[in-house]
Design a protein with these regions (language model features):
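Hydrophobic repeat-domain scaffold segments
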Residues: 247, 251, 308-314, 319-449
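GGW-centered surface loops in extracellular recognition modules
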Residues: 1-19, 426-427, 431, 435, ...
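A short glycine-rich, aromatic-capped structural motif
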Residues: 447-506, 515-535, 615-616, 692, ...
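Functional-site microenvironments in short loops/helix caps that host divalent-cation chemistry
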Residues: 461, 508-513, 522-675, 702
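Short, structured beta-strand segments at or near domain termini in extracellular proteins/domains
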Residues: 684-700
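P-loop NTPase signaling cores
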Residues: 35-286, 293, 300-306, 316-321
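Charged, amphipathic alpha-helical linker segments immediately N-terminal to NTP-binding catalytic cores
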Residues: 4-46
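Short, polar loop/linker segments at the starts of domains and inter-domain junctions
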Residues: 37-53, 143-153, 307-308, 462-480, ...
Length: 703
């Protein structure tokens, strides 16, 4: 088998390699995308009692590739991404060569899809054997630093597997992305898997159009059991034998496959992060040669790539061991100077280092750490160029929140000011801001999350030329109204639940990191009930007049607030920021988050009237009736409020209500200002929410 930058599996030469690689201990990877996510349209109709009984069923990485053809497989170092690529390459080539062991049967072997289940299911793969090609970008760079193109042989492949993205210069990504796009354009039927750490892939630009991001799931109990069984030296190990119990302090570190596998073979088994990594260090040749400083130097000093690779190999090619030692070096003395250099030098990989430091921090003296972490926060007025230091300080402090009352510290007020500035100004990357949103929630988000923006009376173009349900395009007149700047968030909806006792199927209502996230898993009836409650509350408090009510918007109001005066053009998608898609402007499937986030993280996704998050994030309920047929509305355009579509009082639950805006699971063509969806009013999902309108009547559209 040819080795180096390029792996093309030739089974006449590679049986020994494949045996070492597989070692019969291969555990198929799962991703965080679930069957429930894929089947959400049918599940939205299920009762809340039934949904509470459903355990998430995760797709495998192979099935993610089967679904999307071009995928970004992201996850922390040590989670098995490289092993998956090699096994996939071996088994595809093995199927073509009629290998008795490494073939499609091996790569599609059954998996347990749930956290605790025991039912095995064969993985779904539809396209048979494909000619594979595995590219290791790091080795490619070592071979020729001036290389700006892939080897010509890659063009013969039907399945292209790319590893080593973590280790290339970010500037090199530009030509790598260009090569990938060219190969994709030459043959749209090609399959691609690009493996990378999440912190790196999330920040690399340009993005790859047409690629779907999937996150590798941490180990389930079923996977841990299989690893324990396969790594056991006991020949009499029986099914049903209990797994080794993971200590609470090690639970985060042992979510990673490589670390858990190593831990199961240790005797006695370490009970803390420190003892675990110290035991790992004993296996390394450099254990006696200043390992902490060597690891710190690995990350902070510019060195020849071959020298860096030599150090990496000497630590068993274990990136987490290197990170542990580098963090340990920082904590010895001069923490601020050392750690600041470490994370700023790392650029894309800094958050992986921060996560390691947080694991170590749990076992350290909280009082000492508090002053060290607070001192990371800059003084003075917030500035974009220093904001990363404030965010790191907030994230580290969050980890020791249970040991000390940090929120009473005077400097926390300054820290919160910086974190809010990151959120509101769109500083740093989207993924940094997602962390900032969580930390702002914990510190106490002092934005006015129930803020209303005023929409003046006027007329606008409603609809577009792209879909029949959005036509004909027409000019619609609207009365003045007010609408929520943000979707209704958890902290506001929880107040309603606490006062009324209404049932809410949500795991977020008591989560201190998600108070400023959109309230989700809500039916149309939930949204209406909330509005009725808030009407009475705000009238009593004098926030609205006695002749004003709170309600959900009509379709026309929602679209006007989202698009403003933007005119529809043929073949043009319309968003709050204008026409044409922009990366990182909103939370849709293209972002790859597969989750909500704090409201207001995307200042570019602000409508002309000041509304945020109207594209992506969550589908938003409207008052307008759709009809019984999910594909074709009973009430077509042009919009007419007098034709019965706003007569919700007598509508039955089989009559769908309109939903707008798309969600984190929607593609860019669905998360527009014009796309129309419909759902039964008893349906709900973790991507469904709403925002409020305040007006003097029940129908804001004028004739």
């Amino acid at each position: 088998m040819q080795q180096g930058s390029l792996f093309r599996m030739q089974f006449s030469m590679s049986d020994s390699f494949s045996a070492v690689l597989a070692n019969d201990g291969y555990i198929p990877l799962l991703v965080t995308y679930t069957k429930q996510d894929a089947e959400i349209n049918s599940l939205r109709k299920a009762s809340k009692d039934d949904l509470m009984k459903l355990e998430p069923e995760y797709f495998s990485a192979l099935e993610a590739l089967n679904r999307s053809k071009c995928i970004l497989l992201v996850g922390d170092s040590g989670m098995g991404k490289t092993t998956f690529l090699k096994m996939l390459c071996i088994c595809m080539e093995g199927e073509l060569e009629n290998h008795p062991k490494y073939n499609l049967a091996k790569i599609t072997e059954p998996v347990v899809r749930t956290e605790t289940g025991i039912v095995l299911e064969v993985q779904k793969w539809d396209d048979g054997a494909l000619r594979p090609f595995l590219l290791d970008l790091e080795s490619l760079a070592l071979e020729d630093r001036n290389r700006k193109k892939f080897p010509d042989e890659v063009k013969d492949a039907e399945l292209i597997l790319i590893d080593g993205v973590d280790d290339i210069d970010p500037e090199d990504w530009k030509w790598v992305a260009s090569e990938i796009e060219m190969l994709h354009a030459e043959d749209p039927d090609r399959y691609f898997v690009i493996a990378c750490e999440a912190d790196v892939m999330n920040r690399l630009r340009p993005r790859l159009p047409g690629f779907t991001s999937y996150t590798v799931k941490t180990l389930t109990d079923a996977q841990k059991y299989l690893i324990s069984k396969q790594s056991s030296d006991d020949p009499d190990f029986q099914d049903g034998e209990p797994m080794p119990k993971v200590p609470i302090g090690l639970s985060e570190a042992l979510k990673i496959t490589q670390s858990y596998l190593s831990w199961t073979t240790m005797d006695p088994k370490p009970q803390s992060v420190q003892t675990f990594f110290e035991a790992e260090l004993e296996k390394s040749p450099l254990a006696k040669a200043e390992p902490e400083f060597t690891a710190y130097k690995y990350f902070t000093q510019k060195m020849d790539q071959r020298e860096q690779q030599k150090i990496f190999a000497s630590f068993q090619s274990d990136m987490n061991q290197l990170r542990y030692l580098a963090c340990k070096y920082c904590l010895e003395e001069n923490f601020n100077t050392r750690f600041e250099k470490l994370v700023l030098e790392l650029n894309y990989q800094s958050w992986a280092m921060i996560r390691m430091l947080k694991m170590i921090a749990k076992e350290k003296n909280a009082e000492n750490l508090k002053s060290m972490f607070l001192d990371l926060c800059p003084n003075g007025e917030p500035k974009a160029e220093l904001s990363i230091k404030a965010l790191i300080a907030a994230d580290l402090l969050f980890e020791i929140r249970d040991k000390i009352d940090i929120l009473r510290e005077k400097k926390v007020i300054q820290l919160k000011k910086w974190i809010r500035a990151i959120v509101e100004n769109g500083w740093l990357t989207v993924y940094d801001r997602i962390i900032a949103g969580k930390r702002l929630s914990w510190l106490g988000d002092d934005r006015e999350l129930t803020e209303l923006v005023s929409i003046p009376a006027g007329s606008f173009t409603m609809g577009d030329y792209l879909l029949p349900n959005n036509q004909p395009v027409a000019e619609i007149k609207i009365k003045a109204f007010k609408i929520g700047r943000y979707p209704v968030v958890n902290t506001t909806y929880k107040e309603f639940i606490d006062q009324t006792g209404r049932f809410w199927l949500s795991e977020e209502k008591d989560n201190c990191e998600r108070r400023n996230y959109p309230a989700i898993n809500l039916t149309w009836h939930d949204a209406v009930a909330f509005c009725n409650w808030l009407t009475e509350k705000w009238q009593t408090e004098g926030k609205i007049q006695r002749d004003e009510i709170v309600r959900i918007p009509t379709e026309a109001e929602w679209e006007y607030a989202a698009r403003g005066k933007i005119i529809s053009q043929p073949d043009t998608l319309i968003y709050a920021w204008g026409s044409g898609w922009q990366d990182d402007y909103c939370n849709t499937r293209e972002l790859g988050l597969n989750d909500t986030c704090a409201v207001g993280l995307f200042p570019q996704n602000e409508s002309a009237f000041g509304c945020l998050d109207m594209n992506g994030m969550v589908w938003e309920w409207n008052s307008t009736l759709w009809g019984a047929d999910p594909k074709s509305p009973d009430y077509p355009y042009p919009y007419d409020p007098c034709d019965g579509r706003e007569n919700t009082k007598d509508a039955l639950d089989n009559i769908r209500r309109c939903m707008r805006g798309g969600s984190f699971g929607s593609t860019a063509d669905h998360a527009t200002c014009c796309y129309r969806g419909g759902l039964e009013p008893i349906g709900f999902w973790r991507g469904d929410g709403f925002r409020i309108v305040v007006s003097k009547d029940n129908n804001g559209t004028r004739n």
